[in-house]
Amino acid sequence: MTDFTLTKDADGIATITWDVVGKSMNVLSLEGWDDLDGCVTDALGDDAVKGIVITSGKDTFAGGMDLNVIAKMKAMSGDDPAAGLMDGLMKSHAILRKIERANLDPKTNKGGKPVACVLPGTALGIGFEIPLACHRIF
């Protein structure tokens, strides 16, 4: 099961819903980053999609990053944990930047797709960074 799901409606709105199964509040894992990246890439690449909404399937938006993520990044990096952590942070930054730019033309800053975040409640840590990367927060 994925932490983020993508649905598209007939009006051209793609909705990315964050709903971590088995948790009372959404927390971001490494797998969750991959899910979010895949959903955003899919929505941005679909010409039928005119806009993107990111929201939560829970009463709150997010409690932040799963604290085990840092330990996983260190473990995956082998002999150079600092490089592993930096790689993880840069991957996170790239995904947030993808949301922020949303296919804008890099020379003219025109085009692209609007991305809105609908917060049903609390947004902490990375759960606040994601909405900040969006164009509007509701």
Description of each model-found segment:
Residues 99-138:
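Glycine-rich beta-to-alpha active-site loop
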